[in-house]
Amino acid sequence: MTAPDATIARKQHRTLEPYHGLVYFSAEAAAGYAALGVTDGQMGYFASRSAPLGAVPAEVVIATFYNFAEAEVRRCIPTAWALASPGDLLEARLDGIDGSLRRILGDEVIGATDVAEAAELAQRAAAACTPQGRPLCAGHLALPWPEPAHLRLWHALSILREHRGDGHIACLVEREVDGCEALVLHGAMGEVPAAILQSSRARTDEEWGAAVDRLQQRHWLDGQGRLTELGRSARQSVEDRTDQLALAPWLHLGRPGCDRLRQLVRPLSRAIVESGSFGFRPPRPPS
């Protein structure tokens, strides 16, 4: 059997991400948080995603989410915990993603044997995720496995996503790239407009400009804010190392299992993206 190389980790992430990430743009989840008193969309995002860690202080969310403006995190945390407990938010989150997946994919699709097979494969991969040095992954590993299969699949992909994300932050720290600098570098790649990255992470113009200045001093950006060859190489090294650190669960699953999981989840992710429900900002709850 041919073992996966590090690039398989990136392939898995790109295909599987919409199925997990839908929860952050779920109108059903936002309505559930609002019913608990968390009516602010950004607050719902911070609180629901960090809820597996418990009612943590703002500093923990700043550390683990990494690229969001500190002031925005402090606006939301710990205020959220006075409105709703982590346990209640986790329940609303699971109910919300259940509702969103049923609305977008339909009961027939989520009840199909393909989804059950995908859940089994994803759970097998997630079993190889270790908690050491990966706090968000560790929190999700401690949660009970939900049923039915479409929720088990979502939970497994959430563990795998946080495992990769925690590793990515470790790579950024090792290269001395702070959260705002990481956003600037991402924007300079041209894949996502810089303005969207800045606004979605609540970064001020002053913070953004200072990050650009620091990257120019390192010769990673030129005078027009474009990536230099040095900057492009540095960012690519972070992405490559992220893939390496994310590889363990995919090695455990093996190449045939990885390929099959992507094959099974690809049409689900495509349907989620095509539904228009996958975006850059948490939704506002319905009025």
Kindly label every feature range from the protein language model.
Residues A202-F278:
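Accessory, usually C-terminal, subdomains that scaffold auxiliary metal cofactors
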Residues M1-G209, R281-S287:
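Phosphate/adenylate-binding glycine loop and adjacent helical scaffold
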